[in-house]
């Protein structure tokens, strides 16, 4: 992508409405634009990041055995009345009526709809276990939306729902998602700590929040420092193996970890003082096992191997991509801007033409842009007439991991400068060497 043809409205000043770093940087870099309270447009730069975050989530959901579908944002009130949650959910749920005066709602969650889909098609235990997920917009009418897309009213969610014959199967499904979430957050450059959580309006008796540590987090968290060094499940993880899933779950729940809502001071004090960690954190994922809460109310049953009807056991598993993006920024930035982890940056490499219109610079930049693009990189070419300082500031604030700087003096010697955005390390080399080095490190 040539920057001269890309829509990226950079703001020179810090927006007054932004209270935290991620909100400020997302507005300044032109990633998002507020349309009304808690509702945002994702502009091209932000959409590129969001798409890459979603791609990682999809890969790990698919790896764990979940199957993608897509449910609508608008739901019939009848399903919620059937489950008993229509009146209980409260004012966060946006209720509307269609032209036939039928009550509808803008879905804040999808337990009722997915249960209705399941009961319509699945009749036998032979079709279990089953885990279905989608990535879709939701709406919750927050009293006080704040912090940009960190706590907005309309937001994107990945929701997965598992269906099993009995509790043992459901707990295995829960542990599969537990391991999948650890892998997902690690690939997004985050160390997420699973903490026992309240089930809230979704219900159930087993739940974990996945929390990343950040000074701007809304939650106060208490945990053992060992979590910072635990190994993440590898690519070869066998999600079907019960023993493997049990081992991962037991390891990651063997140490104390709790948010302030679930905190037990005596248990935390029992940890040796040097191994305690108290900090603030951001919730980036939440998983629930809620047994037969919805399946019982809505008649989701299958014939078991004994020939009798069994009410299925369910779980739900949520990750908010539009919340994850600012969470990643909160965990990875400096005074100059965002530092994106590789793989989710809007671009992999930015080629900075220090003197657009200079034949030697234009030729070298053209080659870098072409060859690196053919090698599979997402490349941004800054071919604008902006002054050098402005180009460097733009490259830094949008957080592209690698900068290749092409100036008339260096290119006269056949050389360019390669800068690592995270470390600030710089290295001068030939154009050929720069291409080879970047391709080899891919």
Swiss-Prot record:
Catalyzes the attachment of proline to tRNA(Pro) in a two-step reaction: proline is first activated by ATP to form Pro-AMP and then transferred to the acceptor end of tRNA(Pro). It comes from the Bacteria. GO terms for cellular component: cytosol. Homodimer. It comes from Sinorhizobium medicae (strain WSM419). PANTHER family: MITOCHONDRIAL RIBOSOME PROTEIN L39/PROLYL-TRNA LIGASE FAMILY MEMBER (PTHR42753), PROLINE--TRNA LIGASE (PTHR42753:SF2). The lineage of its organism: Bacteria, Pseudomonadati, Pseudomonadota, Alphaproteobacteria, Hyphomicrobiales. Keywords: Aminoacyl-tRNA synthetase, ATP-binding, Cytoplasm, Ligase, Nucleotide-binding, Protein biosynthesis. GO terms for biological process: prolyl-tRNA aminoacylation. Belongs to the class-II aminoacyl-tRNA synthetase family. ProS type 2 subfamily. Gene3D superfamilies: Anticodon-binding domain, Bira Bifunctional Protein, Domain 2. It is an enzyme of class 6 (ligase). This is Proline--tRNA ligase. It is found in: Cytoplasm. Its EC number is 6.1.1.15. It catalyses: tRNA(Pro) + L-proline + ATP = L-prolyl-tRNA(Pro) + AMP + diphosphate. GO terms for molecular function: ATP binding; proline-tRNA ligase activity. Disulfide bonds: none annotated. InterPro entries: aa-tRNA-synt_IIb, aa-tRNA-synth_II, aa-tRNA-synth_II/BPL/LPL, Anticodon-bd, Anticodon-bd_dom_sf, Pro-tRNA-ligase_IIa, Pro-tRNA-synth_IIa_bac-type, Pro-tRNA_synthetase.
